[in-house]
Each structure stands twice: as C-alpha cells, then as structure tokens.
Amino acid sequence: MKIKPILELIPEVKRPLKGVSFKEKIQWTGLVLILYFILGTIDIYMGGAEMPAMFAFWQTVTASKMGTLITLGIGPIVTAGIIMQLLVGSELISLDLSKPMNRALFQGLQKLFGIFLCFLEAVMFVGAGAFGVVNSTLALILVLQLALGAILVIYLDEIVSRYGIGSGIGLFIAAGVAQTIFVGAFGAEGYLWKFFSAMSVGSLGIAFEYILPILSTLFVFLVVVYVESIRVEIPLAHGRVKGAVGKYPIKFIYVSNLPVILAAALFANIQLWGMFLDRMGYPILGQYSNGTAVSGIAYYFSTPYGISNIISDPLHAIFYTLMMVIFCILFGLFWVETSGLDAKSMAKKLGNLDMAIKGFRKSQKSIEQRLKRYIKPITVMGSAFVGFLAAAADFTGALGGGTGVLLTVSIVYRLYEQLVQEQLSELHPAVAKFVGKR
C-alpha cells in the first residue's frame, strides 16, 4: 500500500505563490495568536462532568488550557515529531532526509500521524479520568471535541510556518507561559503583592518565599539571554569577489529550544500513559494518587518542583536531571539530521552561495569537513546545557515552570532574530539571502 496517495488527501494550508512581505507575516502571526487565545476561551461540552485539577504537568509544554478546545494543545504535533524522529533515527523508516523530496514525505507522514494522535490522546485523556467517570456517549462526545481542537491547532501551526514568523509551536508556548508569569507575578493574588504585604508586617521569611519564584524567573531569563549570545564564528571568503569576507556563526544553542520541547513533551506523555494505564488497572509505569505519580518509572520522570522535594528525595531529582540531559542530546542530534542543519546540508548551502572557509580549498567537501568539527560537538554541548538548565530551573519553582520560562525566553529571542532577518530581506534581499540560509 502506497502512502503518498493518502497524504495527498489530507487538507493542507496552501503554500504562498509569492514571497510574503514582512508586514503580512506580522499580520498572519498576530491573527493566529488571537485565534489560539479565542480557542482557549471556548469551553467544550462536558455534560456536567467536572475536570479534576491533576493535569498541570500537561499544560506548560503543550501550551494547553484544560476544559477548552485547546485541552490537548500542541501535544499531538510534538509527540508525532518525537516518534517520527525516533523511527527515522533508528532506521525503522528508511528515509534519506538530505533529499528535499524525502523531507517533504517525512513532514507529510508526521502530519498524518499527528492527526491520528489527536484522536488517540483524546481517548487517553478521557480514559485517564480527566473528566471523571463518564458514560460511553459522553466519552465519545468529549473525544471528538478534544480531537477537533487539536486538529485546528495543527493547521494554525501550519499557517504560521508558511505565512508567519517562527513556528506556531513556539508561539503558543511563549504566549501561554508569558500569560502565566504575568498573572502569577502581578495578578490579584500574585507573588509580588504577597511579597509587599509580608514585608509590611515584618514577616521576612514568608516574604522571601514569595519573592523567590520571581527571582528564579529573572535568573533563568538572564542565563538564557547570555547563553543565546555565545557562538563560534567561522571566517568565510567569497569566491567571486576578491577580498570580500564574512563570518558564519554557529550558536552554542545550535538547535534552539527544540530538544527541551521534545524531551518535556515525552515526559508529559509518560505521565499521561501512566495515568491511563493505572486507571485501566495496569500500573505498568507506576501508581498514581490524586493524579500524581507515587511509584514506578512515571514517578522518576515527573518533575520534582521546589527545593523541599529535592531534599526529601535527591535520587528522584538526580534521575530526572540525567534523563532530561540525555534526551535533550538525543533529540538535538536527531533534529540536526532531520531539519537540514547537519554539516553536509549547511556546506551545500554555503557552496551554492559561492562561499568558502577562509584559508581552505573552495569545495563542498572541504567546507563539510570543517563544519563537522564544530556542529556535532556544539549540538551535544548545547543540548546538554539546555536540558540541565531546564531541570534546574524547574527545581527553583520559577513562575510558569522552569522549563516554560527557558522555552519562552529562547523562543522570544529567536523570534526577535527572525524579525531582524525579515526586515533585512526587505531592505536588502542580497544580504538576507545569506542571513536567511544560515
């Protein structure tokens, strides 16, 4: 059975026939963000069922809002990406992703699988007790609503990818976490007002507890901004213009925040599967109490928020940190290969621009060998660092979750860079041609 005819039947957002202007990209990005917030205000029909407050682990990394059309958030998209990368990386699916045609096939398969996961994760949510005990008719209605909302999110992400700036996944995460941080700090019951209130009555110990999440959030913000500026610059020479030189920057966080998004989504899925299986009477991944894993592998993959939890069970914190680092490295390496950021693909792009590494022969092979010395080690180190920082930030109790803050700052920083590139493309297309292909 051939898969391509099936992929052709899946509706898709039409690709732009001509270049989308900077102004139009801003408009499309803003419109999609507004639509996403609107979806987050539309409650699904629950037939009187109540949603227990036990799915907090799911909300940050999936940019979801429980009980609305975006209850599943970007979960199906990200989970599909994880599984497809693992299948290609282990060669269970044989695809040479250096070829554009195969990359297009990979993206089509990922989208098809993502739509399937919209229904599967909806079934798991209902089965895991997200809406309490419901009858079969209401369960079906809930599943269809959750799946429909998740499919809409897939297409909103596709609109941003083709007509907007950045990716919908990053945009939705950043918007959700930013909202959580603002409400947590400045809302009516925000930590800032509680801090001032405690200080006014001289309760310094309590005041410190209230200000610590805000300080932790600021610390993560400053660390991420600093690390985003670290890069290795490789000198380049132009083949046709004598004396023309440039620099090719390879960032320390080479694959951006994708490894953390994928790793955190994997951990959230382990919790979801564990809760579902435990409710079905098969506690393979662990046992749960009030929606929290208390034993098994699911317990060790759950985030130990706060210093008190680390002190009470340091083994849990060590295992969680180690797994976050390992999976970030694996996903970082997979992402480099599947997204055309590997040395071979980048050497080809530089060669097409008639660029060569200064002091070396002008050949694609020479450029590739030179880039190999940097890209893989930097990918490993950068992915390991963001994994460690995400875990450590979670331990501090930062507003929006440590992982959420890290992702948001990184996403906004990259979005700013893309905005600069888009402006360059309109001011000087020749310059942007090189900048955009980096």
Curated annotation (Swiss-Prot):
UniProt topological domain (Extracellular) ranges: 44-54, 130-136, 187-209, 279-315, 398-400
Membrane topology type: Multi-pass membrane protein
GO (cellular component) term, any one: plasma membrane
A single BP term in Gene Ontology: intracellular protein transmembrane transport
Pfam families: SecY
Source organism superkingdom: Archaea
Intramembrane sequence windows: 55-62, 63-74, 75-83
InterPro entries: SecY, SecY/SEC61-alpha, SecY_CS, SecY_dom_sf
Record field: transmembrane: 1-43, 55-83, 105-129, 137-161, 168-186, 210-231, 257-278, 316-335, 379-397, 401-415
Residues exposed to the Cytoplasmic side: 84-104, 162-167, 232-256, 336-378, 416-438
Subcellular location(s) per record: Cell membrane
This protein's UniProt keywords: Cell membrane, Membrane, Protein transport, Translocation, Transmembrane, Transmembrane helix, Transport
PANTHER family (alphabetical): SECY/SEC61-ALPHA FAMILY MEMBER
Summary of subunit composition and partner proteins: Component of the Sec protein translocase complex. Heterotrimer consisting of alpha (SecY), beta (SecG) and gamma (SecE) subunits. The heterotrimers can form oligomers, although 1 heterotrimer is thought to be able to translocate proteins. Interacts with the ribosome. May interact with SecDF, and other proteins may be involved.
Family according to the record: Belongs to the SecY/SEC61-alpha family.
Functional description taken from the UniProt entry: The central subunit of the protein translocation channel SecYEG. Consists of two halves formed by TMs 1-5 and 6-10. These two domains form a lateral gate at the front which open onto the bilayer between TMs 2 and 7, and are clamped together by SecE at the back. The channel is closed by both a pore ring composed of hydrophobic SecY resides and a short helix (helix 2A) on the extracellular side of the membrane which forms a plug. The plug probably moves laterally to allow the channel to open. The ring and the pore may move independently.
Protein name in the entry: Protein translocase subunit SecY
Lineage: Archaea, Methanobacteriati, Methanobacteriota, Methanomada group, Methanococci
